[in-house]
């Protein structure tokens, strides 16, 4: 289905022609788009310990960055920007905005960062190493993307693939909503996988050399020690299933500052609407599910309705009220992973 959000393209057309290939500017992607969050509400979020925020101020040719939390947000009348990450975790409207982009797998969705800038405000020319949609809220912003210049207004949407140099400057007090995507790097992924293997137990062995002879060249690493290390490391093996499980747990792991609030009260699951908490990441591969860094494997019968919850982030409780699944949902509610609402 063609989407106004994507300039009249279907998601398939957009992904084929633009995704990770070239920028796209969509005028009027969300006509009449207003503020999902106010300036004061954004400042309130910036005061919290569980929210990442920063202020960037331009003075002459230099920019100064201060990290939050801030007891009080004081922005200059010009050349200042407040940026708050993960607004979708705290503001339902921002979470709904993020879900408009669910034609991209949930494993790739990251968060909604909101910036409020005074005239002249901006973070400066830079390159991101991830895909991003930049949706303009109230107020105008001038963009320079590579060698092109243009001005955006409320409801305009700019898509940028990784590696494209860009610079945005507020022409008047304005909001910009950045919908970012995760793109794990090889070194980061490799280090995390080795940690994951270590937690599950690596081969235990201790180097011994009872036949050691006096060293004629003390600085040389003994060949026997190299052989020992080679034999030991060759015993470290893994399967595709191990990689799948690691990746699911890794991609669903909440960010360090995320805190879940335990569910309050009891509600009959069969008469409830089950909604994932905005902070919850629920992914799956086959009948194995990954939620907030944990994994569980279910029967196909139980997996089918849970996939619906993962895909849509909301499901009728009656679909999830089986004995095994019902107990699981109740446990997740106690942990604050899901919200039970009146159906």
Language-model segments: residues:
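Active-site region of the double-stranded beta-helix
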Residues: 1-17, 30-156, 164-206
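N-terminal auxiliary "cap/dimerization" subdomain that precedes the catalytic jelly-roll/cupin core
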Residues: 1-63, 287-342
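Hydrophobic/basic alpha-helical segments enriched in Actinobacteria
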Residues: 88-93, 154, 181, 281-284, ...
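Generic recognition of stable, solvent-exposed alpha-helical segments in well-folded globular domains
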Residues: 153, 188-189, 224-227, 324-327
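Long, charge-rich alpha-helical interaction segments
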Residues: 194-252
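Acidic, low-complexity/disordered tracts enriched in E/D and polar residues
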Residues: 234-309, 330, 341-343
């Amino acid at each position: 289905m063609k989407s106004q959000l994507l300039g009249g393209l279907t998601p398939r057309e957009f992904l084929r022609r633009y995704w990770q290939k070239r920028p796209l500017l969509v005028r009027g992607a969300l006509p009449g788009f207003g503020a999902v969050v106010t300036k004061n509400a954004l400042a309130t979020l910036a005061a919290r310990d569980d929210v990442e925020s920063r202020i960037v101020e331009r003075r002459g040719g230099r920019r100064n960055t201060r990290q939050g939390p801030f007891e009080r947000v004081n922005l200059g009348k010009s050349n200042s920007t407040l940026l708050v990450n993960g607004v979708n975790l705290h503001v339902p409207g921002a979470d709904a905005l993020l879900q408009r982009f669910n034609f991209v797998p949930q494993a790739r969705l990251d968060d909604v960062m909101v910036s409020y800038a005074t005239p002249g405000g901006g973070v400066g020319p830079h390159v991101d190493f991830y895909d991003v949609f930049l949706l303009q809220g109230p107020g105008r912003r001038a963009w320079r993307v590579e060698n092109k210049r243009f001005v955006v207004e409320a409801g305009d949407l700019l898509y940028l693939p990784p590696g494209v140099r860009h610079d945005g400057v507020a022409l008047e007090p304005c909001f910009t909503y950045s919908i970012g995507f995760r793109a794990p790097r090889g070194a980061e992924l490799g280090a995390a996988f080795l940690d994951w293997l270590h937690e599950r137990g690596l081969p235990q062995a201790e180097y011994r050399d009872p036949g050691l002879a006096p060293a004629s060249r003390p600085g040389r690493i003994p060949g026997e020690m190299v052989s020992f290390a080679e034999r030991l490391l060759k015993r470290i093996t893994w399967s595709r299933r191990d990689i799948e499980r690691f990746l699911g747990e890794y991609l669903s792991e909440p960010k360090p500052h995320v805190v879940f609030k335990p569910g309050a009260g009891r509600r009959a699951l069969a008469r409830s609407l089950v909604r994932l908490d905005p902070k919850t990441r629920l992914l799956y591969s086959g009948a194995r599910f990954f939620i907030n860094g944990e994994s569980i494997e279910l029967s196909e019968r139980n997996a089918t309705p849970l996939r619906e919850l993962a895909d849509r982030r909301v499901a009728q409780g009656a679909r999830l009220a089986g004995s095994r699944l019902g107990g699981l949902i109740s446990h997740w509610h106690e942990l604050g992973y899901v919200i039970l609402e009146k159906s």
